[in-house]
């Protein structure tokens, strides 16, 4: 028998906790036998004194096991259960293409996603822009769509990882969100509860990233790779660039449109293509579908070019209650803003830097993101045709188009976009889309 206060005391004194102590505390978080004050105290003790790798693995697996852990064996699937998770960014629409692409190559992708908060967009919010799409189906429908389409992208259900829900809300209110150990456990407990064989982790770097510096992003990527592999799920983390908007747009309906254009081949933003291919190729290799990056890329390009990935995206949407002809008639179903107008820079030159976080917040001020949890969204608003770093900016070339509902909202977003996109005299050096891969062998 353990006492919560003795576990807190140990961590306060910078001692390592045993697996059994961590399991006891997490059970207490779930069944309310540990108080909010005790949870806050442990969070602060971990924030200051950290956890070693064994503690992180124990915390992650205990939280994973605090609720239902999905098991796919009864479905007799003929491929691996694979997924990807991103730390979040602006214009990060990767999941919408990557899930169908991986499924078209023979994987099964039960993707449990989140909503946007702060400056980052949420995958579920994008799907909410599609009429009829159920982001919270019952378990039977979720499993049916995963089996039949190969991919289903839905929200977290109440029976998955209840310990994280309670722990995270307390961390959010007590300034302990930024602990690498606690971030690792929060992310991975949710992902691993989906019963995955393999995971590709997209850790963003730059002005639109969750972590403030490259070093912090790399530390998180290393922690996630070590803990996930330690918990029995093959995982690689990629450090990817978020110093500019990833797609050509940011918002909800506008990003769904770009995802459909990508899958059908109407338009593929080169930066978005590189990061999507990098993550998806890693998933195929970890899942044993491809034995090399070259083979994985060849398979992925084939399912893009022959339309199979687009067809699977359509099958997932109709399977979860959306329109059966969504791919063919995307424009009929997605909402559109009253005002769609260009923004011009005040000077000419080159797009030299971007405050990506501020661009994400501009979408929030338009109504496309949340100021606080539970806020209703306007799915039609956002930014499109956002310039890329290095683009030449002239007096008649817009730096972006704003989709707004009112003149006031347009004016506010216009000022924010002009401030966030810096125009300089010299063309900036090109940054890589993917800085590095962190595999288990690199640790």
Curated annotation (Swiss-Prot):
Its EC number is 2.4.2.4. Disulfide bonds: none annotated. GO terms for molecular function: 1,4-alpha-oligoglucan phosphorylase activity; thymidine phosphorylase activity. One of its GO terms (biological process) is pyrimidine nucleobase metabolic process. The keyword Disulfide bond does not apply. SMART domains: PYNP_C. SUPFAM superfamilies: Nucleoside phosphorylase/phosphoribosyltransferase catalytic domain, Nucleoside phosphorylase/phosphoribosyltransferase N-terminal domain, Pyrimidine nucleoside phosphorylase C-terminal domain. GO terms for cellular component: cytosol. It comes from the Bacteria. Keywords: Glycosyltransferase, Transferase. Gene3D superfamilies: Nucleoside phosphorylase/phosphoribosyltransferase catalytic domain, Pyrimidine nucleoside phosphorylase-like, C-terminal domain, Transferase, Pyrimidine Nucleoside Phosphorylase, Chain C. It catalyses: thymidine + phosphate = 2-deoxy-alpha-D-ribose 1-phosphate + thymine. Transmembrane segments: none annotated. Pathway: Pyrimidine metabolism; dTMP biosynthesis via salvage pathway; dTMP from thymine: step 1/2. Homodimer. Belongs to the thymidine/pyrimidine-nucleoside phosphorylase family. The enzymes which catalyze the reversible phosphorolysis of pyrimidine nucleosides are involved in the degradation of these compounds and in their utilization as carbon and energy sources, or in the rescue of pyrimidine bases for nucleotide synthesis. This is Thymidine phosphorylase.
């Amino acid at each position: 028998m353990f006492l919560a206060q003795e576990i807190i005391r140990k961590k306060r004194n910078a001692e390592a906790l045993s697996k059994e102590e961590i399991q006891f505390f997490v059970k207490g978080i779930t069944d309310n036998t540990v108080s909010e004050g005790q949870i806050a105290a442990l969070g602060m003790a971990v924030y200051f004194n950290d956890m070693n790798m064994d503690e992180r693995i124990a915390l992650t697996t205990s939280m994973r096991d605090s609720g239902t852990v999905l098991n796919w064996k009864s479905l007799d699937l003929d491929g691996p259960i694979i997924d990807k998770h991103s730390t979040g960014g602006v214009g990060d629409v990767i999941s919408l293409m990557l899930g169908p692409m991986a499924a078209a190559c023979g994987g099964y992708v039960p993707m449990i996603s989140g909503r946007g908060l702060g400056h980052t967009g949420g995958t579920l919010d994008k799907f909410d822009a599609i009429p009829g799409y159920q982001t919270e189906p019952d378990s039977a429908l979720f499993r049916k769509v995963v089996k039949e389409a190969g991919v289903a992208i839905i929200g977290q259900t109440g029976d998955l990882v209840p310990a994280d829900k309670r722990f995270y809300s307390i961390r959010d209110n007590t300034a302990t969100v930024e602990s690498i150990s606690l971030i690792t456990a929060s992310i991975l407990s949710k992902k691993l509860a989906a019963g995955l064989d393999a995971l590709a982790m997209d850790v963003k770097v730059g002005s639109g990233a969750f972590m403030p510096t490259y070093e912090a992003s790399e530390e998180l990527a290393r922690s996630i790779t070590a803990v996930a592999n330690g918990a029995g799920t093959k995982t690689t983390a990629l450090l990817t660039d978020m110093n500019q908007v990833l797609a050509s747009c940011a918002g909800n309906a506008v990003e769904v449109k770009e995802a459909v254009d990508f899958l059908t081949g109407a338009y593929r933003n080169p930066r978005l293509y590189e990061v999507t291919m990098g993550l998806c190729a890693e998933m195929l290799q970890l899942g044993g579908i491809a034995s090399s990056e070259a083979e994985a890329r060849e398979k992925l390009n084939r399912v893009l070019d022959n339309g199979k990935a687009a067809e699977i995206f359509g099958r997932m949407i109709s399977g979860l209650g959306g329109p059966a002809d969504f791919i063919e008639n995307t424009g009929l179903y997605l909402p559109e803003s009253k005002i769609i107008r260009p923004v011009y820079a005040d000077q000419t030159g080159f797009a030299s830097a971007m405050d990506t976080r501020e661009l994400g917040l501009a979408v929030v001020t338009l109504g496309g993101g949340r100021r606080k949890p539970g806020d209703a969204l306007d799915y039609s608003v956002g930014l499109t045709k956002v310039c890329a770093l290095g683009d030449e900016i002239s007096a008649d070339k817009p730096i972006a188009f704003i989709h707004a509902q009112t003149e006031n909202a347009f004016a506010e977003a216009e000022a924010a976009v002009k401030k966030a996109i810096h125009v300089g005299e010299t063309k900036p050096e090109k940054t890589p889309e993917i800085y590095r891969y962190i595999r288990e062998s690199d640790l």
